[in-house]
From Swiss-Prot:
Keyword Metal-binding appears in the UniProt entry: yes
Family as reported in the entry's similarity comment: Belongs to the bacterial solute-binding protein ModA family.
Binding site for molybdate: S56, V163
Main location: periplasm
Function: Probably involved in the binding-dependent system.
Keyword terms, alphabetized: Metal-binding, Periplasm, Signal, Transport
Signal peptide range in chain numbering: 1-19
SUPFAM superfamilies membership: Periplasmic binding protein-like II
Protein name: Putative binding protein HI_1525
Gene Ontology cellular component terms for the protein in this record: outer membrane-bounded periplasmic space
Organism: Haemophilus influenzae (strain ATCC 51907 / DSM 11121 / KW20 / Rd)
Subcellular location as annotated: Periplasm
GO molecular function: metal ion binding; molybdate ion binding
A GO BP annotation: molybdate ion transport
Length: 245
């Protein structure tokens, strides 16, 4: 524990003469650990961080419009790779895994123990919009791998822009089952149950990128390093995310 504190302190104890005001784009489904990391970073450095949350596709479109900001944190490596291909990031790093799971409300789970049973049921499904959020593509791939893609697609009644929005639909009963993140399902495990995922279901990587547009590259690198530090990763795993392999 002392070693962990020492590592974190080394990352965060460099203070600027004038506090930096950083801008971070972050996937909406990552908000809980991000808020904890930002709070500690601000407390220990005196710098400030403004966070713009949204679906990973949404924040990518936003950045491509304004071309300003310091860091970009997405629920899937794909979005940061796109920025890398356009020379908008000069450093990227994987933090944890963002795993899609099929979560079913406990009051609707009776008789549903497989994707076959789900495909034959009358349950209403929700998934993420693959153009807007990281887990949307994972949901589509999960359906394909299940062998019941058409039947499952026919049951979709909503495609959400963020995983947070999708979780609300599930908890409010607007849908009976939804492909959400493992971390979100873990937090409401008293209300939902999970189906075993088909073999090959993609495990997205929560990835951070340091933007070339940063006005404070030194301080942005500091925050980048903290996200990837043992303490930063712990904030994510404490919320149900899985360590990167």
């Amino acid at each position: 524990m002392k070693k962990l504190v020492a590592v974190t302190s080394m990352i965060l104890t460099t203070f600027s003469v004038q506090a930096a005001d950083l801008y971070l784009y972050a996937g909406a489904g990552l908000k809980e650990p991000v808020e904890k990391i930002i709070h500690q970073y601000e407390q220990e450095t005196g710098n400030k961080v403004t966070v713009e949350y949204g679906g990973s596709g949404q924040i990518l479109a936003r950045y491509n419009t304004v071309k300003s900001g310091d860091l970009f944190l997405a629920g899937s490596e794909d979005y940061v790779t796109k920025l890398q291909k356009t020379n908008d990031v000069n450093n990227i790093g994987t933090i944890v895994l963002h795993v899609p799971v099929m979560a079913i409300r406990k009051d609707k789970i009776s008789g549903i123990d497989s994707f076959k049973a789900l495909a034959e049921s009358s349950l209403r499904l929700g998934i993420g919009d693959s153009k807007a959020m990281a887990l949307g593509k994972g949901a589509e791939k999960m359906f394909e791998l299940s062998g019941y893609q058409k039947q499952l697609n026919d049951k979709i009644v909503v495609k959400a822009a963020t995983v947070k929005q999708l979780m609300l639909y599930l908890l409010n009963g607007d849908v009976d089952a939804a492909v959400v993140g493992r971390s979100g399902a873990w937090k409401v495990r008293d209300k939902v149950e999970l189906l075993p995922s088909p073999k090959g279901t993609p495990e997205e990587k929560v990835t951070i990128g340091l933007l070339f547009s940063s006005k404070y590259p030194k301080e942005a690198q500091q925050l980048f390093d903290f996200f990837k530090s043992p303490q930063g990763v712990k904030y994510f795993t404490d919320e149900g995310f899985l360590p990167a392999k």
